[in-house]
Every structure is written in C-alpha cells, then in structure tokens.
Amino acid sequence: GRGSNMRSLVEHQLPVRAVVSNRAEAAGLAFARDRGIPALALDHRAYSSRESFDQALTELIDRYHPEAVILAGFMRILSVGFVRHYEGRLINIHPSLLPAFAGLDTHARALKAGVKVHGATVHFVTPDLDAGPIIVQAAVPVRPDDSEATLAARVLAQEHRIFPLAVQWLLGGQLRIDKGVVHVAGNPPQWMFNAS
C-alpha cells in the first residue's frame, strides 16, 4: 500500500523492528529507511509457490525476533504455515466492518450494497481470509454523495486511530481470545464511531 498505516504506528511511537514488503517500490519502505528502520523487500515472484515465499518471509521476519507481526497493506494471502507460525501475534487491518465486505474493493462494494455505515476492522489473522477474531472496529456514516474516494478517505482516518491502539494492546499483553471473541484487559471500548 501507500504505507500510511505503518506511518501511523511509527508516529504513535510504537516499536517497529523492521518493515518488510513484497514490493520494492512500496512507499512504506522509503519512509522506514528515512527513519533508520530496517526496510526490506522480498519479491514473491522469485518463488515457485506461495509456501516457498512464505517460508522465506518467515525466515526474514524471524531474524528480527518480533513480538508481533503487523500486516498493513500487505496484499497477499498468506499460507496456513505462515499464519500458524505467528498465531496470536499476527494482526491485520481491513477497510470494512468485518464480516461484511471481506477481500478487495470494499468501498465500492459498500456503496453498491447501499449500506449506511462502513468502517475499518483490526483483527487477528487466521487461515480464513479476513475472518479472524475482531480486536477493534471504527465506523463512519456512508453519505448519499459519497464516492469511493471520499468514503475511503474517511475510513482511512479511522484506521489511523484504531490500528495503533490495537497494536498497543497486543504488545502490552492486554488481548485475550475466548471462544473466538477478543477481550481487552480493563474493558476499554473496542469500537469507535465518527459521525462526520
């Protein structure tokens, strides 16, 4: 992606040990390098299978001994082996109120469906696409005059609010999953609504 969610994590002073992308031209890599954060590209096209790429990706990530692996604009479906390796430490941000509009083109699909509320979700990653336990969500109204671009901009602003929060909870050991439901120590709100 554009790297804006990763930038949001850095700007919230969360510890980022490395930034990895499968695209050498990813904007987030340059941002990380400019701040002295190791920034690495691993081209998935150099590998014969998803599993072989994910194995190389795992080996690269593990060199940094991460407490968590945070997916921000990483647009590849990960293998079961990769997901299991980081189970409970692997989270993603998705531009919809899951379980609605999993996958791609969320804003266009939301507008076409005529939903009145749209938003973003931070969730644990499981082998099933965009189906992991939900950590936090933020909602925005869908306006009658919204385009994909205007809706996406409002959702992205909410992503920048909830993603650092979820990462902070994860790194602080505040998250617990019970029967597929995420609980946060201290019971802070796990949702936000911005009426504007």
Q: Which sequence ranges carry the predicted segments?
A:
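Short beta->alpha connector loops at strand-helix junctions that form conserved
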Residues: 40-45, 93
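N-terminal Rossmann-like dinucleotide-binding module
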Residues: 2-31
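Glycine-rich phosphate-binding loop signature in dinucleotide/nucleotide-binding domains
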Residues: 60-66
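Short, structured coil segments at secondary-structure junctions
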Residues: 35-36, 86
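Donor/substrate-binding cores of folate-linked one-carbon enzymes
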Residues: 12, 22, 68, 72-185
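Glycine-rich, highly charged phosphate/nucleotide-binding loops
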Residues: 45-59
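Conserved beta-strand segments of alpha/beta enzyme cores
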Residues: 15-18, 38-40, 89
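Short, basic/aromatic-enriched C-terminal tail that caps enzymatic domains
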Residues: 7, 179-196
